[in-house]
Amino acid sequence: MEALKTATFSPMSVLSEKRSEPRKPFSLPNLFPPKSQRPISQESFLKRFNGGLALLTSVLSSATAPAKSLTYEEALQQSMTTSSSFDSDGLIEGISNFVTDNPLVIAGGVAALAVPFVLSQVLNKKPKSWGVESAKNAYTKLGTDDNAQLLDIRATADFRQVGSPNIKGLGKKAVSTVYNGEDKPGFLKKLSLKFKDPENTTLYILDKFDGNSELVAELVALNGFKSAYAIKDGAEGPRGWLNSSLPWIEPKKTLSLDLSSLTDSISGVFGESSDGVSVALGVAAAAGLSVFAFTEIETILQLLGSAALVQLAGKKLLFAEDRKQTLKQVDEFLNTKVAPKELVDELKEIGKALLPQSTSNKALPAPATVTAEAESATATTTTVDKPVPEPETVAATTTTVDKPVPEPEPVPEPVPVPAIEAAVAAQVITEPTETEAKPKPHSRPLSPYASYPDLKPPSSPMPSQP
């Protein structure tokens, strides 16, 4: 009977069942116990989670819709399903369905999370410390930035052939250091000696047009310099320094020496200390001065001569007393030492030009007229002090006429008077003295052959034929 009575009972709600225990206030299960409690296992955690989830769904369903009574079988089935394991496939399917149903919401959430991350990376990223700049921009920044310097890495031969950039108008000077790709530590060591504060120095690097400037810019930027930029197209490129019409120093056509190798070798022997550098500079300066003195010796002598003339004029000719004494000394020197020598030399040159040279030749004697003139000349020279009376000459002529003329004898050759003695006699006897007898003109010829036409003068002997 009791079984039949229970079978005929109407179904009742589980929640409305009366219990003998006092009702406790409603509270959600404690999913996260305090740390002081002992850790629970995974199974108990899943059971509690499922129970809480079922209770939550029932509360929500009762709040949204009027409560419905459940049968005993439904309540039993519901409790059995809640106690089963957690269905992960259903959760994933639910999430995928939510994403497909609400794409804009998902995209907005992703953007909201991604934008702050991207901005933080962009804003906190440091700028690149090396790069490439055009020649005009580099020149402008060299003028505006006090810590910017121009580094020329070309070879020495390029300096001699092409020239070098001129930044003196900006108050700076280009630093030249030849780049050797095989010796990068040595190159960096040279730069450290030339730039004392590399952490605050920005370099603008100029090459020929071979691309080495970009390699050097990256090298120095990674090794202590603040930043470094390669000048685009270098010095000789189509948009380089020269073709951009920037200031340029043309190469000099004088003798130049490359002492960089000598300096490097000496610094390698003595090290990079100050003593080694001073020795290298001293040797280079001595070599340069010696070569300059050897090539410009003529100019140096001219300068010394000009300095001596200026000193002489300042000391000897500036004041009146010194000027008089100097002029007196010059006059004495010219009159006592220079003038006599010049006079004797001039007389010798005049004598050689006017008088014939004395040569011994065996030619025919001069005609009678010439001998007569020579005799008269010798008579005048010998009878300067004692004039010859005229009657004796007349008597001599009369006596020679009366006597018969003997056969002519060979006339001896007259002794020639030296030309120098004749010249001296002509110079000494310039005016006749008072006691000298002036010859009177003869009315008759001196030759006796004019009075005797039958007589003929003797013929001169023929010279011997060779």
Curated annotation (Swiss-Prot):
Consequence of gene disruption: Slight reduction in rosette size, yellowish inflorescences and siliques and small chloroplasts with irregular morphology and no starch grains.
Ranges annotated as biased composition (Pro residues): 455-466
Transit peptide region: 1-15, 16-69
GO cellular component, one term: chloroplast thylakoid membrane protein complex
Tissue: Expressed in leaves and stems, and at lower levels in flowers and siliques (at protein level).
Membrane topology qualifier: Multi-pass membrane protein
GO biological process: photosynthetic electron transport in photosystem II
PANTHER family the record matches: RHODANESE-LIKE DOMAIN-CONTAINING PROTEIN 4, CHLOROPLASTIC
Name by which UniProt lists this protein: Rhodanese-like domain-containing protein 4, chloroplastic
